[in-house]
Swiss-Prot record:
Pfam families: DUF179
Family the entry assigns: Belongs to the UPF0301 (AlgH) family.
GO cellular component: cytosol
Protein name: UPF0301 protein VC_0467
Classification via InterPro entries: AlgH-like
Annotated PANTHER family: UNCHARACTERIZED PROTEIN YQGE, UPF0301 PROTEIN YQGE
Length: 187
């Protein structure tokens, strides 16, 4: 099972308050573990505020300043000082990994210089930190009924209001959160 380019959607019964009602985009999943970014956990800083904190000046005139008011997200509890930009592919940046035709992840600072300008990606979220699992850890959590998995949808990442992402992700399975039980079935 490879969950790269899938969402992990926290079950309503998620016991860990850090991940309660979270939606995580899985960037990498292999025999060594998994790495993903929470896409619905905004923190109390805007993209523009973050750019000021790290002394990033825009490479072009800021024609899209409204986007600088977007929140930065908590990507997860690991390396919270590291930034990740989940975006629609546009240009090639120094350190980008194209996940699909519609989703890429960039960790280099060069993408930050185009945020708020006409050269910015069509859709993006900025996350600090990531969610990580050691080898076999995610698989155990799945058998414990902690997560639902669904194929990633760029519309949910980039165009769905933050407060609706968890419910919309569950609805993609054709169910509502109220229909979910925390009890795993055994045959």
């Amino acid at each position: 099972m490879n969950l790269t380019n899938h969402f992990l959607v926290a079950m309503p019964s998620m016991k860990d308050p850090y991940f309660k009602r979270s939606v995580i985009y899985i960037c990498e999943h292999n025999q060594d573990g998994a790495m993903g970014l929470m896409i619905n956990a905004p923190i109390d800083i805007t993209v523009g505020g973050m750019l000021k904190q790290v002394d990033i000046e825009p490479a072009y005139p800021q024609s899209h300043q409204e986007n600088l008011k977007k929140p930065v997200f908590n990507g997860g509890p690991v390396s919270e000082d590291r930034g990740f930009i989940l975006h629609r592919p546009r240009d090639h940046y120094e350190s980008s990994m194209k996940m699909t035709d519609d989703i890429a992840v960039t960790t280099s600072k060069d993408i930050l210089t185009v945020l708020g300008t006409e050269a910015e990606p069509e859709g993006y979220i900025v996350a600090l930190g990531y969610s990580g699992w050691s080898a076999g850890q995610l698989e155990v959590e799945l058998t414990e009924n902690s997560w639902l998995t669904i194929e990633a949808d760029p519309e949910l990442i980039f165009n769905t209001p933050v407060h609706e992402k968890w419910q919309k992700a569950i609805q993609k399975l054709g169910i509502s959160p109220a229909q979910l039980s925390s009890d795993a079935g055994h045959a």
